[in-house]
Amino acid sequence: MNDLMTKSFMSYVDLKKAAMKDMEAGPDFDLEMASTKADKMDENLSSFLEEAEYVKAEMGLISETLARIEQYHEESKGVHKAESVKSLRNKISNEIVSGLRKAKSIKSKLEEMDKANKEIKRLSGTPVYRSRTAVTNGLRKKLKEVMMEFQGLRQKMMSEYKETVERRYFTVTGEHANDEMIEKIITDNAGGEEFLTRAIQEHGKGKVLETVVEIQDRYDAAKEIEKSLLELHQVFLDMAVMVESQGEQMDEIEHHVINASHYVADGANELKTAKSHQRNSRKWMCIGIIVLLLIILIVVIPIITSFSSS
């Protein structure tokens, strides 16, 4: 059963064996009843694993979606035309929408699996429940990895957006912008009165306006993407709460399993000690009887001999 706790996914046969082993270890094990329960396990475990594989596949697709978002983001850093920036922004937005749809589907499926697990616990008892919950917990751990991957990408995109604005500022003015100026350009809808006035005086209105339009497009893209990413992030956060909650339940289950194994081990040791005491008691009893017989013989034989002589 400990193996079940440490593996994310197990085959159907392994799950069934683990659950059957738990039932056989129970105090009220009945062969006929176990056979009936095994038939029920055949039904619910096979369909359950199909659902688990579906969730696992969807999480794989989300990882692929994140990889494409990162690819489009890297491409956007090398383009300057408004049309190209807009095209890549649309691609990123579409990927985010797709990822959001998959994340919501996974969240819904995990909630359904949780409800089914609780029902299984009520109807079939803890062995099958622990088997199913262990697999569900493995899915959540995988989901948590995807969530951390997404969070890293989100932070990277917003950080590099500021770096892009800084580079464009340097291209126009020949100077490096400090954090305050970058924030001003971004929050003022790419205006930044000081930046615009100085740049127009030094480089002409046409070139500056072209750069400002590019920064504006990047700003619009960044805000739109950030809004979508925040929505996706909220879904991940909701599922993270589910991960922690189920993780605590799994820790409690594992704690009980470990305690049970300790109790069994302690009981076996106590039984072994009791048997040892019993053997020692019998040994000393035999020795006592033998000594008593020897004493009787030592006392009785001389008496008999004296009577015979007289």
From Swiss-Prot:
UniProt keyword annotation of Cell inner membrane present: no
Domain of life: Eukaryota
Modified residues (N-acetylmethionine): 1
Membrane-crossing segments per the record: 284-304
Tissue-specificity statement: Abundant in flowers and developing siliques. A low level expression is seen in the seedlings, roots, and leaves.
Induction description: At or soon after the onset of mitosis.
Gene Ontology CC: cell plate; endomembrane system; phragmoplast; plasma membrane; plasmodesma
Vesicular topology ranges: 305-310
t-SNARE coiled-coil homology domain segment(s): 212-274
Gene Ontology biological process terms in this record: cell division; intracellular protein transport; vesicle-mediated transport
An example molecular function term from Gene Ontology annotations: SNAP receptor activity
Subcellular location: Membrane
UniProt topology in membrane: Single-pass type IV membrane protein
Coiled coil, from the record: 94-159
Cytoplasmic side: 1-283
Keywords tagged on the record: Acetylation, Cell cycle, Cell division, Coiled coil, Membrane, Protein transport, Transmembrane, Transmembrane helix, Transport
Main location: membrane
PANTHER family, sorted: SYNTAXIN, SYNTAXIN-RELATED PROTEIN KNOLLE
Functional description taken from the UniProt entry: Involved in cytokinesis. Acts as a cell plate-specific syntaxin, required for the fusion of vesicles at the plane of cell division.
Family: Belongs to the syntaxin family.
Subunit structure: Interacts with SNAP33 and/or NPSN11 to form a t-SNARE complex and with KEULE.
Protein name stated in the entry: Syntaxin-related protein KNOLLE
Native species: Arabidopsis thaliana
Classification lineage: Eukaryota, Viridiplantae, Streptophyta, Embryophyta, Tracheophyta
Name of the coding gene: KN
